[in-house]
Amino acid sequence: MGNVPLLREVGKCQRNMFGRSTASSKGSSNSRSSSSTSPKKGPRREADALMFIQIFIHLLKSNIGTGFLGLPLAVKNAGLLVGPVSLLAIGALTVHCMDILLNCACHLTQRLQRSFVNYEETTMYSLETCPSPWLRTHSVWGRYVVSFLLIVTQLGFCSVYFMFLADNLQQIMEEAHFTSNVCQPRQSLVMTSILDTRFYMLTILPFLILLVLIQNPQVLSIFSTLATITTLSSLALIFEYLIQTPHHSNLPLVANWKTFLLFFGTAIFTFEGVGMVLPLKSQMKSPQQFPAVLYLGMSFVIFLYICLGTLGYMKFGTDTQASITLNLPICWLYQSVKLMYSVGIFFTYALQFHVPAEIIVPYVVSRVSENWALFVDLTVRTALVCLTCFSAVLIPRLDLVISLVGSVSSSALAIIIPPLLEIATFYSENISCATIVKDIMISILGLLGCVLGTYQALYEMTQQTHFYMANSTRVHI
């Protein structure tokens, strides 16, 4: 794979993706005017350029996380027929929007004579050329909105990681005394839980605080390697179990429309890599090959999504839980699967957290004297970790938080914004009416999913508080 660690390369992309957050508003306006006339050096250097297979691996890694393990429940919420078909449709729509984003960014780099523009810059420069005078005047707000959505999405991922770690750790600890080498199917029995899930979240908190204080790229690359190894090993064992018979029959092909709204949020959340498309292309040794990597990689990702979601739902039926790891049988083999995947998620937390921290921390530190810089740096990082933890404590429902984050921020970044950018970018260049209608319809579809999915997730959160309290005393053996 080369001498440069893969994570270090992607970390550079992610930091460049968000731009210079510490610049003042006055300075940013000056930099925009000057950058339009002079080329800007992009994040890719020839020595650091990544090969086809490396970009392919990064694309897979950026789209396989905790949301991936929630797809069986998502298929349950949509139905055995509607779920896989909808996953395919949403996947195709998301990839199309990624392609739109790439085309807009490529066009703007040529127009502005720059080597690279990130998502926020693409939004800002697109608005500067749109037909609306008001939007042209306030184009910088497009950059701020996208940056805010990216931060919310990344911190939302971190909150989901807290819940995932707590749920799996609770199950491992409370089932340890009757776990053996013989795998037994999991059946539901009502028993008194030893400790609440929230206790495990608070137990994990200090370890994650210590983890995020590590900022050395070489150490982070080691974390990335460990996360990749444990995640791939766990997924191999999970798929090995899912293909075994028996499977449930007579499962509903079409589910309730209200639960389908939860499916939409989960499906969009699972496509976590939309923010990585532009920086990954900028890091590629042969950028002209990136569309091939994108379509090949995302086709494989969608195939994995459909397989896991469908096989998982067929395997566990109505007992399907928020994460498929919670449905695995009781034996040391599959307890080790939970442990390995949890280790991978634990280290991935630091990688996901690194992105919003690189935006927020420098901005805050620049407001204090040098004597207080280190203290403020550590304090802000600690506060952000605590924020993600307390968010998980307040809403300890993994499936609903995944759906909420997906509906609120992921849908905007993946579906709503890119088509609007295409209209704004190419409006002055005689864009066809058919393309405008197509883009408007895609954005409206994404907006409907965002509003209705958010409403349904919030409704379920308020209505099922008592359900969670009852479920916290339920252990599976």
Swiss-Prot record:
Where is the protein situated, by its record's location annotation? Membrane
Supply the InterPro entries for this chain. Answer: AA_transpt_TM
One Pfam family from the record: Aa_trans
Spans traversing the lipid bilayer? 55-75, 78-98, 145-165, 203-223, 226-246, 260-280, 292-312, 345-365, 375-395, 400-420, 433-453
How the protein sits in the membrane? Multi-pass membrane protein
Question: Which UniProt keywords are given for this protein, alphabetically ordered?
Answer: Membrane, Transmembrane, Transmembrane helix
Region Disordered: what ranges? Answer: 19-43
Q: Where is the composition biased (Low complexity)?
A: 19-40
Which residue spans adopt a coiled-coil conformation according to this UniProt entry? none
Q: Name the family the entry cites.
A: Belongs to the amino acid/polyamine transporter 2 family.
> What name does the UniProt record give this protein?
Proton-coupled amino acid transporter 3
**What is the scientific name of the source organism?**
Mus musculus (Mouse)
